Amino acid sequence: MSSQPFTNKVIALTGSASGIGLETAKLLASRGARLSLADIQEDKLKELQAXXESEYHVDVITTKVDVRKFGEVEAWINKTIDNFGKLDGSANLAGVAPESIGLKGIVEQDLDEWEFVLGVNLTGTMNSLKAQLKVMANNGSIVNASSIRGLTGAAKNASYSSAKHGIIGLTRTAAKEVGGKGIRVNAICPGRISTPMLKTAENSIGLHLQPGSANYPPIALGRDGEAKEVAQLVAFLLSDESTYISGADISIDGGWRC
């Protein structure tokens, strides 16, 4: 395989400023991709752009986007086409976890928090798909971020789990709709990944799980995953090495669910 398998390919990413999105952007840049990066954190996007252009000598544009707002998402994708002339792939990785995760059940669910979590995670993915599929090149590829919580239920996790289940439904629907154009749509389902979002979630409940502790999940590999490891999966699904994979929800959880 070429060390630059994404040369001349244009890839759009949401959630690019931190965690899995950040590591995916860096990996794709190292493999020659031309990137259109979106996030709500504009300063961090600019830092990533400067680092990717300097280190990998690739073309990068950035846009501050609230994925809950379709107008902003569509304007970002139109900007991508204006700058690069095409869109070969996208990774919709923007996401948030609720402050009440692990603390409040459905009866106690704050509805403003519900709307925010569903808005970013589920509506944000829908908005991204809607804008991207209007312009996606034939034989393109899209990766959406679901979660282990999109595959299994968990108490006191209503908004996040519902959103992540919904993303799998969106992914399967999109795959059926655009398969005739050779466009593939898949979902990744990470487990415990060491990211700022995981740290924030654990801080909110005052519980920091450590491998080997009594309350650590039954993860076969006995550790948290790294964002770089998930980025490798995203890159594979965007690449020409996965051309017969579509409509899939792929776990990357260290053997948590097995």
UniProtKB/Swiss-Prot annotation:
Question: Where in the sequence is the active site?
Answer: 146 (proton donor), 160 (proton donor), 164 (lowers pka of active site tyr)
Q: In which pathway does it act?
A: Hormone biosynthesis
Q: Which residues bind NADP(+)?
A: 20, 66, 130, 160, 164, 193, 195
Q: Provide this UniProt record's keywords sorted from A to Z.
A: NADP, Oxidoreductase, Virulence
What outcome is recorded for mutants in which this gene has been deleted? Reduces the production of abscisic acid (ABA) and accumulates a compound that corresponds probably to 1',4'-trans-diol-ABA.
Q: What is its EC number?
A: 1.1.1.-
Q: Which Pfam families match?
A: adh_short_C2 (PF13561)
Query: By its UniProt entry, which Gene3D superfamilies does this protein fall under?
Result: NAD(P)-binding Rossmann-like Domain (3.40.50.720)
What is this protein called in UniProt?
Short-chain dehydrogenase/reductase aba4
